[in-house]
Amino acid sequence: LHFFDGRIAQVQALKVAVLGTDSAVGKRTTAWLLVDAFRTAGRRAELVGTGQTAWLQGARHSLILDSLINDFVSGEIEHAVWSCWEDGRPDVIVLEGQGSLLNPAYPGGFELLAAGRPDVVVMQHAPARREYDGFPGNRLHDLPTQIRAVELISGRRVGAVTINHEDLDAAGIEAARAAITAETGLPAFDVLREGADGLCRALSPWLHEADARRGSGVAGRDG
């Protein structure tokens, strides 16, 4: 097991964290689709998995977050991301989120922000969901509040919103996308229906920053 030691600053790949507004909302699926989209675009991309399923699905650089003693969580996240960078020098590393920052039972995400230090965050959201999954009476915090919480804690921007379209028909999906963009100013994508190419393009400003960083040999903003 590893303690956090700051070597995350050596990682010059674009780091994208896929977080969510709830548990069981589609973060891992979106993360895989984003990896595939970057690869299709000719980029070397890897997923750092944080749960059992991503590990079973073949994410080479993974950790099982809920099996760790708390003292080692940050260090193991850092080690997984750093090892991913050292092993293949990918252009992009996508970090799979767990739970959600404001979830009363599974308050995941802070560790990824603190130790993984993503350059940008993608927020997965189920527009039709009103309560936290499995906890009736616990109203889901609204999307702008959850975005503000992530940005305040991380000092990084949420660059896009991805939609879990449960309980929405085609018209409802398009209405939800338009409402999210109007409310947050962010592009919204249903990657399960349309793939993640558009999401990949929306993240291009951060990718270009990472390319410039590698070209100049300068470490990231935390280095």
Could you describe each region identified by the protein language model?
Residues 1-14, 74-86, 91-193:
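Conserved catalytic-core segment of NTP-binding enzymes
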Residues 3-41:
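Walker A (P-loop) phosphate-binding motif
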Residues 24, 28-32, 56-57, 101-106:
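Short glycine/serine/threonine-rich phosphate/pyrophosphate-binding segments
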Residues 41-54:
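Short beta-strand-centered segment that lines the nucleotide-binding/catalytic pocket of NTP-utilizing
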Residues 47-49, 64-66, 98-99:
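A structural signal for small-residue-enriched, beta-sheet-centric alpha/beta enzyme cores
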Residues 53-70:
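P-loop NTPase switch/communication element
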Residues 180, 188-217:
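Peripheral docking tails and interdomain loops at the edges
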